[in-house]
A protein has these predicted regions:
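Structural signature of tandem alpha-helical TPR/SEL1-like repeats
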Residues: 1-2, 30-42, 66-75, 102-111, ...
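TPR/TPR-like alpha-solenoid signature
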Residues: 17, 38, 53, 74, ...
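Terminal, low-structured helical/coil segments at or just beyond the last alpha-helical repeat
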Residues: 156-201
Length: 201
């Protein structure tokens, strides 16, 4: 940790982020959210996307500062502009929930889909939820089944409920088609099976 402090003092954003993480989690130091935020902010000022995201999460969760989705979104957008998937998911979630900005389920769907294609499990779960529920999008239960199954494979346990509910809504033929597409996705990745996945009802 001494080496990280030396690098952090010299302005290294990754070292500053690492120290922030130690204080956030209480790893080898006393857990102090305000100190963690200070280090994350320094790293974020240095342009480190992971620090911008973690700072945004602390605002959203109200750790070290008053809970504020609006403030968190400032940092999520900075990290998202650098391509960070986790931050792009959080922006989509804010559109879905109407937290920190006006609710927009269409933009939420687009954000979840984009990051789900990249393999982000939480996005796959939320996309499956929207497709099963018909939440401002056309209900597609077979697609919901596959997306939920993909999320579950990655350990997103909430997706099991969606997968099982979707299975109850599709007949034997659609189930067979969904399982075939799922096997394609597992072997070739989501981008490799996307055309087949999009063709499912």
């Amino acid at each position: 940790m001494r080496a990280w402090y030396d690098l952090a003092a010299a302005g290294d954003p990754q070292a500053q982020h690492n120290i922030g993480y130690l204080y956030e989690e209480g790893l080898g130091v006393t857990q102090q959210y305000d100190v963690a935020m200070d280090w994350y902010r320094r790293a974020a000022d240095g342009g480190l996307a992971e620090a911008e995201h973690n700072l945004g999460m602390m605002y959203v969760e109200g750790r070290g500062a008053a809970k504020s989705w609006a403030q968190g979104l400032i940092y999520f957008r900075k990290a998202a502009d650098k391509g960070l998937t986790e931050s792009r998911y959080m922006i989509a979630l804010s559109y879905f929930e109407g937290e920190g900005q006006i609710q927009n389920r269409r933009l939420a769907y687009e954000g979840f889909r984009d990051t789900a294609i990249e393999g982000y499990a939480d996005s796959q779960y939320m996309l499956s939820f929207m497709l099963l529920d018909g939440t401002d999008v056309k209900r597609r239960s077979a697609q919901a089944y596959v997306w939920a199954a993909l999320a579950l494979i990655q350990g997103q346990q909430q997706a099991q409920e969606i997968r099982d509910a979707a299975a109850m809504r599709i007949d034997e033929k659609k189930t067979s088609d969904a399982l075939f597409v799922l096997s394609q996705c597992e072997s070739s990745g989501v981008r490799g099976c996307l055309l087949s996945l999009d063709s499912l009802p």
